[in-house]
Amino acid sequence: MSILSFLLGEKKKTASVAKERLQIILAHERTASGAPADYLPALQRELVAVISKYVKIGNDDIKVNLERQDNLEVLEVKIEIPQA
């Protein structure tokens, strides 16, 4: 790595920055409209997959819930881990 590239740093391409910003705006618009969070089942499956690498759990041992009140969103994740 040259000193010049170190000082100036690697810049992200404007297209990728614009894409990231658009994704954030779209996600915000979806949640502001009161539409149900369609990512919750996928989040629950991924959590089961990750946690089951370390502890034996089933799909029913994890509950994921999203609550909206005024301008506040609360993502609640309940994980029941069996006694060892």
Swiss-Prot record:
Keywords: Cell cycle, Cell division. It comes from the Bacteria. The keyword DNA damage does not apply. Pfam families: MinE (PF03776). InterPro entries: MinE, MinE_sf. HAMAP family: MinE (MF_00262). Belongs to the MinE family. Prevents the cell division inhibition by proteins MinC and MinD at internal division sites while permitting inhibition at polar sites. This ensures cell division at the proper site by restricting the formation of a division septum at the midpoint of the long axis of the cell. This is Cell division topological specificity factor. It comes from Ralstonia pickettii (strain 12J).
